[in-house]
């Protein structure tokens, strides 16, 4: 339970806040029932900080019973907002209510312990403010001392000054407050002098982000004489300055010394002085005597008379100036304390964000860094230009120098940066002189190679390196990957991939040669066309690279760039789409390369690969569902998918396409299959291949036939008046698009109809889906670089992503193993009889029940993947004949009980396949 005191410890929370336990219990909402279901959650807003509860599935009577911990002050106002979460739209506000902690503390005798509040929810609409329901919350764990509210026992006055204006919360100031003499400047600046009078039970004066300008001389209190001095960091100090602004709760113990202090002329007359106030020490401490500069203190009577003449209530500029001249005439020249003036100038500088100035019991000034929870005697300076403060994943503060692209743990200052620059300049000059002396007549081989590089500079973010065996490789800092292929030549249309086992290297002079790792030989001749890098000509060399080699090369890239550990994905089957979207988009793209550990809520299954396969299969079926308007079928007779131009109706459609791109890349990276594939033109666009008119035939036969007719016939004889412009209708809105600049005024003729056909083909593939395609490819490229797919064509990419759909029964039987059964067991014979009699759909359902997916890899059942690599289909004898069959998707194993008849086996298998959903543990 948090207890507040006037000098509460602020080591954990630098702003003096206290912890309050807020339990959001339930709500009763006046709204229509939503047949599609919705999720209700509550936001608690405390001084701009938002804390959310979990989502409740009830739409009218949601219950949470969730405890939230918030940091508050006695003046905090708690705001509760009840929201309705929507999947494809922005969340809707259902109502809001507020609690004033100050009133609640006064009502409940400064104690909030298990206080139950029934809040009326309201919402502003076009007809006014309407009541939308009730919210039940419980406040607990906050006890405030009386001094923290009234701040004094005998005088309830609390003075809060903000921007120079005095605000009195509890009425006019009491007559028992200490009389204070002040000289006001032109801008209402407080240049006060504490008197020797000491008044007990006086109220504190708070200065908030402004100049301390009391409306009358009797509004500032002195600190009690016997109050113990605070310690640094253990309790609140006497004088606090946050970001250069003073918050003086009371003077130090020196206030009881007899005598009238001398006021600094700079503080009294400077019109641009900040709100920082420093208590003036007594005259006996200010006036000193030395050999070079002797200052003789005046008598007490003279000082008092001067103080009366100076500190009259009518403090105009002229009178205050003449008064100070009179005070200075009493002293020799130069008697003003230089230390005092210097400290005044230092305090006018603004502290960096998160820093606070305090004083210890000995009056020494120190500084608190609330960002790192450390203290220092040196005054912090603002960061030099080009520097930035950051926090790493372990909450450690470090500093980034964008000028040199370096980082450091130590906070930089202008002096340290200046010293480092001088040292670095001298070091560079010395190294340059030494290098110029040592290599006077030598040329840099790397510089010569870079100048002679026929491909020019590398793309942005790429770097060329050499390993220990002098093999050149390339680093992509954008995706944190490495590869052997040169990115400048990778994916060129006019250059085909190398044969298996071959590699391109460059000499020191930049001449390209080829390495055959099969025979461990090198040659200047290109094995693809026989042309030499040195001499032109030579015979053509035919070669063929199979799909298996490409797939093995892709798997090698994935394994070499995989990260250790695993990433958990906790989803519910009822909200699979939204849960997966929130978690995948919250992770860093490179974290998605870690091994996946999927958890279905409410199910106790352990993921050794089987749950991940089912998650990919189920989620792909969900996200590619045309019902969400993100994708549509490519044609009437083609059930492959393509991006829906009407997907812009969803305001967050680009975020969803980026998520789908990440998800598809994860499926390729982890070797999992999805349920439904895309159209072949979409795969070609992923591979950056040019789309032709022939690709239109598979997605829009009518459009394709129209363009073919235009190509094969004379359109001028037919009298067709066509222009380089086309209309498109999306959701009933018709828009016109020019195929080229000014196309609506350019007539299509026999001479330019080929250009028209090409532009129409390009427009048909990209109409209304440019932004969606870019978002999809950006999300895909964040996980799997598109360069890794350069060797594949669109059909091979489809097989990699969707697998094989046809089931070869002979291959299935040939690659099945048995445990406690034999090939001639009657249950095994009945099982294969059941598989032969069913259609392909039931076989797919059976395959999904056992392996987690209904798709097969390219190699068929021989390449089924288990938890630790390839694992064949297995049938094991388990249980009694009254049991249902069970499956272990991580190991591709079917537990088949010893049934006594074929009819019993068929009935149990069909029931398990069609009715079972979920995982458990044995």
From Swiss-Prot:
Reactions accelerated catalytically: S-ubiquitinyl-[E2 ubiquitin-conjugating enzyme]-L-cysteine + [acceptor protein]-L-lysine = [E2 ubiquitin-conjugating enzyme]-L-cysteine + N(6)-ubiquitinyl-[acceptor protein]-L-lysine
Any one Gene Ontology BP term: symbiont entry into host cell
Annotated phenotype, changing residue 806 to P: Strongly reduces ubiquitin transfer
Effect annotated for changing residue 798 to A: Reduces ubiquitin transfer. Strongly reduces ubiquitin transfer
Free-text description of this protein's post-translational modifications in UniProt: Auto-ubiquitinated and ubiquitinated by RNF11.
Active site: 890
Main location: cytoplasm
A Gene Ontology term for the protein's cellular component: extracellular exosome
Outcome (variant: residue 621 to A): Strongly reduces ubiquitin transfer
A Pfam family matched in the record: C2
Localisation: Cytoplasm; Cell membrane; Nucleus; Cell junction
E.C. designation(s): 2.3.2.26
Result of changing residue 855 to A: Abolishes ubiquitin transfer
Chain intervals with Polar residues compositional bias: 210-219, 243-278, 286-302, 314-323, 340-351
Annotated site location: Required for ubiquitin-thioester formation: 890
Top EC category: transferase
Sequence segments annotated as region (Required for interaction with and ubiquitination of AMOTL2. Required for interaction with YAP1): 349-531
Entry-linked PANTHER family: HECT DOMAIN UBIQUITIN-PROTEIN LIGASE, NEDD4-LIKE E3 UBIQUITIN-PROTEIN LIGASE WWP1
Protein name: NEDD4-like E3 ubiquitin-protein ligase WWP1
Organism classification: Eukaryota, Metazoa, Chordata, Craniata, Vertebrata
Gene transcribed to yield this protein: WWP1
């Amino acid at each position: 339970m948090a207890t507040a005191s006037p000098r509460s410890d602020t080591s954990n929370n630098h702003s003096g806040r206290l912890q309050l336990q807020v339990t959001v219990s339930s709500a009763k909402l006046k709204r229509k029932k939503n047949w599609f279901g919705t999720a209700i959650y509550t936001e608690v807003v405390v001084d701009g900080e938002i804390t959310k509860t979990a989502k409740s599935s009830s739409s009218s009577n949601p219950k949470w019973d969730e405890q939230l911990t918030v940091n508050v002050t006695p003046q905090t106002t708690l705001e509760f907002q009840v929201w309705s979460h929507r999947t494809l739209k922005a969340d809707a506000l259902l109502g809001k209510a507020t609690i004033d902690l100050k009133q609640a503390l006064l009502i409940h005798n400064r104690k909030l312990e298990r206080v139950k509040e029934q809040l009326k929810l309201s919402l502003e609409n076009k007809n006014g403010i309407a009541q939308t329901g009730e919210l039940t919350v419980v406040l607990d764990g906050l006890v405030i001392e009386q001094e923290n509210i009234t701040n004094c026992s005998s005088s309830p006055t609390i003075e809060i000054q903000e921007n120079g204006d005095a605000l009195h919360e509890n009425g006019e100031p009491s007559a028992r407050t200490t009389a204070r003499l002040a000289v006001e400047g032109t801008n209402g600046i407080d240049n006060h002098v504490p008197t020797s009078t000491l008044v007990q039970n006086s109220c504190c004066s708070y200065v908030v982000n402004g100049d301390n300008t009391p409306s009358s001389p009797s509004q500032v209190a002195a600190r009690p004489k016997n109050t113990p001095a605070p310690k640094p960091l253990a309790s609140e100090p006497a004088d606090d300055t946050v970001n250069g602004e003073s918050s003086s709760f009371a003077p130090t113990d020196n206030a009881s010394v007899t005598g009238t202090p001398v006021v600094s002329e700079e503080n009294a007359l400077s019109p641009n002085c900040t709100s920082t106030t420093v208590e003036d020490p007594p005259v006996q401490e200010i006036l000193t005597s030395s050999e070079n500069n002797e200052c003789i203190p005046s008598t007490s009577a003279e000082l008092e008379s001067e103080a009366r003449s100076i500190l009259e209530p009518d403090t105009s500029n002229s009178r205050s100036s003449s008064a100070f001249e009179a005070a200075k005439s009493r002293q020799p020249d130069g008697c003003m304390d230089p230390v005092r003036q210097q400290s005044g100038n230092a305090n006018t500088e603004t502290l960096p964000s998160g820093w606070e100035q305090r004083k210890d019991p000995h009056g020494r000034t120190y500084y608190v860094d609330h960002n790192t929870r450390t203290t220092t005697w040196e005054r912090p300076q603002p960061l030099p230009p080009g520097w930035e403060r950051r926090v790493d994943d372990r909450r450690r503060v470090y500093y980034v120098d964008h000028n040199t692209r370096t980082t450091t743990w130590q906070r930089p200052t202008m002096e340290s940066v200046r010293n480092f620059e001088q040292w670095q300049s001298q070091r560079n000059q010395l190294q340059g002189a030494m290098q110029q002396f040592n290599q006077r007549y030598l040329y840099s081989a790397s510089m010569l190679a870079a100048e002679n590089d026929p491909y020019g500079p590398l793309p942005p973010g790429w770097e060329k390196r050499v390993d220990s065996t002098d093999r050149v490789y390339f680093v992509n800092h954008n995706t944190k990957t490495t590869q052997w292929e040169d990115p400048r030549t990778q994916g060129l249309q006019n250059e085909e991939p190398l044969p298996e086992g071959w590699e391109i290297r460059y000499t020191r002079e930049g001449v390209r040669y080829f390495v055959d790792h099969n025979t461990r030989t090198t040659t200047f001749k290109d094995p693809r066309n026989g042309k030499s890098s040195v001499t032109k000509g030579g015979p053509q060399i035919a070669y063929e690279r199979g799909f298996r080699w490409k797939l093995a090369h892709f798997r090698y890239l994935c394994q070499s760039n995989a990260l250790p550990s695993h990433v958990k994905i906790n989803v519910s089957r009822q909200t699979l789409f939204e849960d997966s979207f929130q978690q995948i988009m919250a992770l860093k793209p490179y974290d998605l390369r870690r091994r996946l550990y999927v958890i279905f809520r409410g199910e106790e299954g352990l993921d050794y690969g089987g749950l991940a396969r089912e998650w990919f299969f189920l989620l792909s079926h969900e996200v590619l569902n045309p019902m969400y308007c993100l994708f549509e079928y490519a044609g009437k007779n083609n059930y492959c998918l393509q991006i829906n131009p009407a997907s812009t109706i969803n305001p967050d459609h680009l975020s969803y396409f980026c998520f789908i791109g990440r998800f598809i890349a994860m499926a390729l990276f982890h070797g999992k299959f999805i349920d439904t594939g895309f159209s072949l033109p979409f795969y070609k666009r992923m591979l950056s291949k040019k789309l032709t008119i022939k690709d239109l035939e598979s997605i829009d036969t009518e459009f394709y036939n129209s363009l073919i007719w235009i190509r094969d016939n004379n359109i001028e004889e037919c009298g067709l008046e066509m222009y380089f412009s086309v209309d498109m209708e999306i959701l009933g809105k018709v828009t016109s698009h020019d195929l080229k600049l000014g196309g609506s005024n350019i007539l299509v003729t026999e001479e330019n109809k080929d250009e028209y056909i090409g532009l129409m083909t390009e427009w048909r593939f990209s109409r209304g889906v440019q932004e969606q395609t870019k978002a999809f490819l950006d999300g895909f490229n964040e996980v799997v670089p598109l360069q890794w797919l350069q060797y594949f064509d669109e059909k091979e990419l489809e097989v990699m992503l969707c697998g094989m759909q046809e089931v070869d029964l002979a291959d299935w039987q040939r690659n099945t193993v048995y445990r406690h059964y034999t090939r001639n067991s009657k249950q095994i014979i009945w099982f294969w009889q059941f598989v032969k009699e069913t259609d392909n759909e039931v076989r797919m359902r059976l395959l999904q029940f056992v392996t987690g997916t209904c798709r097969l890899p390219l190699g068929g059942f021989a390449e089924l993947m288990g938890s630790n690599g390839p694992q064949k289909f297995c049938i094991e004898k388990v249980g009694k004949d009254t049991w249902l069959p069970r499956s272990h998707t991580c190991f591709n194993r079917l537990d088949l009980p010893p049934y006594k008849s074929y009819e019993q086996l068929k009935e149990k298998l069909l029931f398990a396949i069609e009715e079972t959903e979920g995982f458990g543990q044995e």
